[in-house]
Amino acid sequence: AVGFQVFHFIEHGLQVGYWLLHPKQKPWLTPWAQTGADGLAYWCQLWPGSGRASQRGAEFLHLVGNSVFFAGVMAIFVLARISNTRSRSAQGAVLFQGLHLVEHVILTATVFMTGTGWGASTMFGRWSGTELSTHRVWWHFIVNGIATTIAVVGLVAVYRSGALTGKSLASR
């Protein structure tokens, strides 16, 4: 899950790069992210809701991805606890990614209910156009950078304790 998140963070870095070259254009998705969003958009058009299917697909893709990452962060946290590894990063990753996941639950729900995503990354539905695009591109790049860094530091702490190889658990 952490490797998946590192890849996701790189995608947000590519989005920032695209934005730097084309700040007035619609945010760009990598081809694999666009394929995922389009695939989910197909199913989203079958469900009732207010938002465009493509918008709902993109939000749902982020919700699924952030749920997978949260599960990985929880695994790091549980391994740290079981192995008695003191890692504020494992705890911090759960808190930070938990809040990030809540943001995506709210964004997805509000897109389905009202057609407009409501959350900190959308300035609570108040911005639109390039103002919104700029904020969202940078918001997600920064938030994902922080979440990824905290999770990697927590994972390294758990690895160094031997919990990933079972050494620290076997000695209990």
How does the language model describe each region?
Residues 1-16, 89-109:
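Hydrophobic alpha-helical membrane-insertion segments
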Residues 17-21, 74-76, 110-113:
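Membrane-interfacial alpha-helical segments at the cytosolic side of multi-pass membrane proteins
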Residues 21-57, 120-136:
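Extracytosolic (periplasmic/ER-lumenal) interhelical loops and adjacent juxtamembrane/interface segments
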Residues 53-72, 132-149:
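Membrane-interface loop-to-helix entry segments
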Residues 73-87:
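Juxtamembrane helix-break-helix junctions at the cytosolic face
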Residues 85, 127-128, 172:
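Long, compositionally biased intrinsically disordered regions
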Residues 103-164:
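Alpha-helical transmembrane segments of multi-pass integral membrane proteins
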Residues 164-172:
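Short, highly charged, low-complexity non-transmembrane loops/tails of multi-pass membrane proteins
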